[in-house]
């Protein structure tokens, strides 16, 4: 009941979403990239987002020998927030207090999620970490599933994730605790992110949120940042992680959340453990077993089965003076 109430409180209704989308159509003249992101199949967007996020994560793992994981995550958030604000025109104008609170909650949640995720994958495999972290999105999907078909699809995804994740994390209790915290924060990321996505700011809400998150989590990431500031190579690589994982990955999420309900979004996130396993195999030589492949297949079946509903777009109605 608590989860459902939280989701309903912070998730825009279908009518509100449609109204916001209509307002966005009226105010904005999107470029070709925005038009493509607004019309491409959500499954394709998720794969693209996942590839970007886990290329960044694989690069981050390689940096952990030289920089503390929480510091890499902090620079990731900082770099992405800075880039997104630079490319967002007029991001500082016309924010309401309610919108700013929502953006701040989203940004702080995202920053903490990144930090705990990196602390976890410093201790456990990338693919298994993402799979266990998927518990959060599964809870969101379960709380928002209303049809039998979607329930069956969710069941396939859950079983696939359990199979893919396995039952062991190399007896690393700290890694398990960190990834479970990241999982809870991922659930909040979906709920708060859906709210921010429907604010008429392109990716400015994401950028501003990440800057706020950077400031809020400075006590966690900044104390170990000395080696990064004095090494242009390390600084550039840390910021590159942010561009791949947050600016590109989360930016695509914002476009997707404007188009589909969070129930479908949460289940489509099952593609991320699959992609993480493949990226871990290619980039980090973390090879999936036969059982892992079975888990991947079950996830893909669940994703294919679910209803492909989208948030209805409303055409702008212009009322003329009869006189």
Per-segment meaning from a language model:
Residues 3-74, 105-108, 112-116, 159-162, ...:
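Glycine-/small-residue-enriched transmembrane alpha-helix faces in small-molecule transporters
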Residues 48, 75, 106, 132, ...:
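Hydrophobic core positions of alpha-helical segments in small-molecule transporters
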Residues 78-83, 132-143, 212-216, 264, ...:
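Alpha-helical transmembrane segments of compact multi-pass small-molecule transporters, enriched
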Residues 48-55, 59, 87, 104-119, ...:
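Hydrophobic alpha-helical transmembrane segments of multi-pass membrane transport proteins
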Residues 41-45, 71-86, 150-156, 174-181, ...:
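Hydrophobic alpha-helical transmembrane segments of multi-pass integral membrane proteins
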Residues 21, 25-32, 77, 270-323:
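C-terminal-most transmembrane helix of multi-pass membrane proteins
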Residues 63, 72, 76, 120, ...:
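Hydrophobic/aromatic residues within transmembrane alpha-helices
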Residues 84, 135, 149-168, 211, ...:
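Hydrophobic transmembrane alpha-helices of multi-pass small-molecule transport proteins
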């Amino acid at each position: 009941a608590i989860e459902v109430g939280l989701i309903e409180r912070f998730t825009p209704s279908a009518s509100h979403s449609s109204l916001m989308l209509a307002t966005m159509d009226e105010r904005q003249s999107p470029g070709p990239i925005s038009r493509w992101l607004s019309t491409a199949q959500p499954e394709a967007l998720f794969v693209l987002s996942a590839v970007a996020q886990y290329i960044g994560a694989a690069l981050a793992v390689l940096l952990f020998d030289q920089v503390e994981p929480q510091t890499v995550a902090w620079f990731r958030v900082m770099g992405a927030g800075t880039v997104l604000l630079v490319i967002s025109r007029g991001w500082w104008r016309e924010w309401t207090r309610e919108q700013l609170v929502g953006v701040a909650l989203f940004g702080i949640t995202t920053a903490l999620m990144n930090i705990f995720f990196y602390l976890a994958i410093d201790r456990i495999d990338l693919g298994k970490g993402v799979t266990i972290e998927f518990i959060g999105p599964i809870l969101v999907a379960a709380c928002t599933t209303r049809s039998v078909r979607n329930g069956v699809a969710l069941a396939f995804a859950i079983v696939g994730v359990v199979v893919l994740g396995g039952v062991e994390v190399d007896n690393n209790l700290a890694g398990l605790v960190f990834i479970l915290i990241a999982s809870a924060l991922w659930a909040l990321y979906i709920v708060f992110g859906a709210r921010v996505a429907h604010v008429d700011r392109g990716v400015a809400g994401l950028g501003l949120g990440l800057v706020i998150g950077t400031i809020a989590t400075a006590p966690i990431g900044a104390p170990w940042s000395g080696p990064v500031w004095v090494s242009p190579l390390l600084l550039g690589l840390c910021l590159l992680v942010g561009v791949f994982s947050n600016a590109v990955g989360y930016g695509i999420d914002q476009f997707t959340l404007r188009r589909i309900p969070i129930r479908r979004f949460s289940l489509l996130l099952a593609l991320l453990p699959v992609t993480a396993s493949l990226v871990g195999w290619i980039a980090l030589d973390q090879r999936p077993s036969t059982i892992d492949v079975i888990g991947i297949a079950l996830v893909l079946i669940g994703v294919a089965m679910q209803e492909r509903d989208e948030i209805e777009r409303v055409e702008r109605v212009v009322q003329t003076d009869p006189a």
